[in-house]
Amino acid sequence: MNDQIYQDLKSLHLSGMAQSWMLLHETRKLGELTLQDGMAMLIQAEHDQRTNNRTARLLSQARFRYNASIEELTFDTAQGRDKNQILSLATCEYIKQGASVLVTGPAGVGKSFIASALGHQACFAGYKVRYANMQKLLEDMHMARIESKAARFFDKMAALDLLVIDDFGMKILDGQQLLDFMELIEDRHGRKSTIIASQLPVKNWYDILAKNPTIADAVLDRVVKSAYRIELNGVSMRK
């Protein structure tokens, strides 16, 4: 009977329940539980497994370069790592608002780590996330154009709850790059959240987009206005 129940639960794709049922059977605890308590335990096991599976899938799809977590952060207000601000962002309320987060500071102070940690936190909360180095993002947009898949590419990017763009500002954008970046930002503006990490202070971002002043103004208005800012300073943590 116990084996049949296990197989039935598996055939119904209730593997969390099935494993919990088998554990209860093997530890001889079935007889100690009321029907209500037993059902509650099985349902919780199924819920936990589905949540864990979904989180693992979201983390894999996000393609993070760094395995980072909020718990690993060392807070230091003097260096811009304000505990209250970062823990507030870790609630993912900014994602519900469709707001941007801008993380700036010199090389090695932890920009990518903080951006990635917030991205991981969003996955744990059930949001669809994608991490992308800016140069790789430009290459992906370029290839999508060449392969006549631009519409599909931009639709997929627009559907992400959170897009994490790392190393923004390493090169000046021009031509189609500016148009593509504008389209990416426009599709997400006010609807979906974007985290941008950069060595350049925000006041210098215009220079990266300056080859088309109209686009530069439009992009910065959408990205910077109402954004949450984390401005890091101090010596490199890589030393």
Could you tell me what each predicted segment is?
Residues 1-7:
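Intrinsically disordered, low-complexity and often Lys/Arg-enriched segments
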Residues 7, 19-22, 40-41, 71, ...:
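Solvent-exposed alpha-helical segments within well-ordered globular domains of core cellular machineries
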Residues 8-14, 29-30, 60-81:
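Dynamic helix-loop-helix/coil hinge segments at AAA+ ATPase domain boundaries and subdomain interfaces
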Residues 14-65:
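Interdomain "pre-motor" coupling segment immediately N-terminal to P-loop NTPase/helicase cores
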Residues 36, 81-159:
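Conserved P-loop
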Residues 45, 121-125, 187:
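Active-site catalytic microenvironments for nucleophilic, acid-base chemistry
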